[in-house]
Regions:
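Conserved Nudix-box catalytic region and its N-terminal flanking loop in Nudix hydrolases
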Residues: 1-55, 134, 138
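Active-site-adjacent beta-strand/loop module that shapes the phosphate/pyrophosphate-binding cleft
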Residues: 49-108
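NUDIX/MutT-family hydrolases
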Residues: 74-81, 94-103, 110-138
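Short Pro/Gly-enriched beta-strand edge/turn motifs at strand-loop
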Residues: 77-81, 182-191
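Amphipathic alpha-helical
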Residues: 156-170
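Active-site metal-binding motif and surrounding structural segment of the metallo-beta-lactamase
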Residues: 225-257
Length: 257
């Protein structure tokens, strides 16, 4: 839908890095929290009826843009990070994280009636969110964990959020990042001869940098898998951690290395 809308309206959001991605972002913003550009570089809350109709029919987003009831002029976003999930399955997902400013509007998200993916929202300082995750008080998907770490690091270096996001947007982080399902639980997908359609076995590293570590199911046999595992072991040692145990959960050939 969004690609077709972009093809049919090539001037829409042509000033952004990727017009298709920007159209998807703006449509999803309306659907999920009722936000849309205000035409002045900030965001506003759209009419609730418009939000509901777009939730029912995605085609309606372009319809309301053409009618002028949804604005896209002067829309600005900063891409601050890109995360591509490791090969858990044949289809991999890429997450692109944007920074959008709401300025002084003080708008509050509004979830669609009866069809929201969310239970609640909260404005959260990055450092407090990271600490809450470390304390097992909230759960975060792995891509968001490394994103929050990047934001906290940039915030410490640059002093305020706007400066932190400006710095991150210059060279958005992407490529290799550790995959943490929980504090002290890191996953390393290793290519193995496992049962199709799977292509990898999940090796786990337990523990935190500087502390004792345990490796579970390091099923590396191929050159590629051995290189991945070797780099991870070097990374662990550089963090001044000690590997105190290796555990194999069972004797299947795709779990033994």
């Amino acid at each position: 839908t969004d690609r077709r809308v972009s093809d049919e309206n090539p001037k829409w959001l042509a000033n952004t890095q990727d017009s298709v991605t920007s159209i998807t972002l703006l449509r999803e913003l309306v659907e999920e929290i009722g936000f849309s550009p205000d035409g002045k570089g900030s965001l506003e809350l759209v009419n609730e009826e418009i939000q509901e109709k777009i939730c029912i029919d995605k085609e309606k987003w372009a319809y309301y843009v053409k009618k002028g009831e949804i604005k896209i002029d002067n829309f600005n976003s900063q891409i601050i990070a890109v995360r591509t999930m490791p090969p858990f399955a044949p289809i991999r997902f890429t997450n692109t994280f944007h920074h959008l400013s709401i300025g002084d509007s003080k708008i509050e998200p509004r979830f669609p009636k009866g069809m929201s993916e969310f239970d609640e929202y909260r404005w959260w300082k990055p450092e407090n969110l990271l600490q809450s995750w470390l304390n097992h008080e909230v759960r975060l998907p792995p891509p968001q964990v490394t994103l929050i770490r990047d934001i906290c690091e940039s915030l410490e270096e640059n002093g305020d959020l706007i400066s932190a996001f400006d710095k991150l947007s210059i060279n958005p982080s992407e490529g290799y990042h550790i995959l943490e399902f929980a504090p002290g639980v890191e996953c390393i997908p290793l290519p193995t001869q496992t049962l199709p359609p799977a292509t990898h076995t999940n090796c786990y590293v337990l523990g935190v940098p500087g502390g004792e570590r345990v490796i579970i199911d390091p099923a590396a046999k191929s050159k590629e898998a051995l290189e991945i595992l070797s780099k991870k072991i070097d990374e662990i040692r550089l963090s001044r951690s000690e590997i105190i145990a290796t555990i194999f959960t069972h004797k299947h050939q795709d779990h033994i290395g």
